[in-house]
Amino acid sequence: MTYLEIEGTNHLSGNVTISGAKNAALPLIVSSILAKNEVKINNVPNVADIKTLISLLENLGAKVNFQNNSALLNTNTLNQTIAKYDIVRKMRASILTLGPLLARFGHCEVSLPGGCAIGQRPIDLHLLALEKMGANIQIKQGYVVASGNLKGNEILFDKITVTGSENIIMAAALAKGKTKLLNVAKEPEVVQLCEVLKDAGLEIKGIGTDELEIYGSDGELLEFKEFSVIPDRIEAGTYLCAGAITNSKITLDKVNATHLSAVLAKLHQMGFETLIAEDSITLLPAKEIKPVEIMTSEYPGFPTDMQAQFMALALKANGTSIIDERLFENRFMHVSELLRMGADIKLNGHIATIVGGKELNAADVMATDLRASSALILAALAAKGTSKVHRIYHLDRGYENLEEKFKGLGVKITRLEE
């Protein structure tokens, strides 16, 4: 197994270039199922989740050429409508193939994502919406088996769901008639999907709001144009926290500050200043790192994917911080590992109380998921001594060239084999 060895540091400096957003690239790659032409997507991050999705599309018969952060996708060769478990189990986002496959072919089978219990994660919202559009859906031996010709309808999502919104937007693109979606996710990644589909000829109104009207093409495939994936706001937020936890001056390049409003607001509350240019953000050191109160919520609120990183940062604050995780259960699995480094954190349900200002010590820690693993790296930067972070395959799912980017900021970080 591979692990990272990270030496605690007092200071970072330099520039880091932000990659394309994994969570935007995934649905955009899947949307090529709706295309009549070859689709070229630029600024695609070279991370494990992208490779998994490309493997899935190739397994369905698509021809994909992925190099130098550009993906060339031809789905005219699709000859399979079964998304198999051995690939889908690696990544929940594979469920995104359900809507477009059903819309294009009138039938498909998609394995339930690994460990995904219906009702706990909102995949049930995907299925209910497709049923409202006329799909016949059954769960058979761990697969969603769907069939039917989709027709537009009015659909209200009971809860805001990013992947659910994306799935149904893609399904509605080829459906017959108008689909009205209410309580749609407004994340930048959802907005870009809508804009790309609009550029491909889809009539869609309300982009960027929680109400969309989509006028389906009744089975006619779309003519895609070449486009680039938006910058990764979570990667950007993670590097901002790396600069903050070491109280350093660093600059992020190729970043969209508008997508980071909630993160920047909390950094400002903690005493940090930022200089924002057209596509860069410079973080300036704080005179004093202040405690903060954070409640996660849907965009444009504070992102749940930044909660773990800010928990690590709060350990350096002079006082007590509160983090209220409102979106997901089991999102505090990094706490037990931070405690091994000397953190003072108490949990009460979905609320974490973090007492900052205590010295962190290096330790061997284990990553439990993608964002938790980045929190452990941040804590290791601020700890005294050399830490080892195990199970870093979680990091490889979502962070491109992580060691090289940290080394460019002056971090002593090494990938080693056990």
Curated annotation (Swiss-Prot):
One of its GO terms (biological process) is regulation of cell shape. It is found in: Cytoplasm. Pathway: Cell wall biogenesis; peptidoglycan biosynthesis. UDP-N-acetyl-alpha-D-glucosamine binds at residues 92, 121-125, 305, 327. Keywords: Cell cycle, Cell division, Cell shape, Cell wall biogenesis/degradation, Cytoplasm, Peptidoglycan synthesis, Pyruvate, Transferase. The keyword Electron transport does not apply. The keyword Cell cycle applies. The active site is at residue 116. The modification 2-(S-cysteinyl)pyruvic acid O-phosphothioketal is found at residue 116. Phosphoenolpyruvate binds at residues 22-23. One of its GO terms (cellular component) is cytoplasm. It catalyses: phosphoenolpyruvate + UDP-N-acetyl-alpha-D-glucosamine = UDP-N-acetyl-3-O-(1-carboxyvinyl)-alpha-D-glucosamine + phosphate. GO terms for molecular function: UDP-N-acetylglucosamine 1-carboxyvinyltransferase activity. Its EC number is 2.5.1.7. It is an enzyme of class 2 (transferase). Cell wall formation. Adds enolpyruvyl to UDP-N-acetylglucosamine. HAMAP family: MurA. PANTHER family: UDP-N-ACETYLGLUCOSAMINE 1-CARBOXYVINYLTRANSFERASE (PTHR43783:SF1). Belongs to the EPSP synthase family. MurA subfamily. This is UDP-N-acetylglucosamine 1-carboxyvinyltransferase. It comes from Campylobacter jejuni (strain RM1221). The gene is murA.
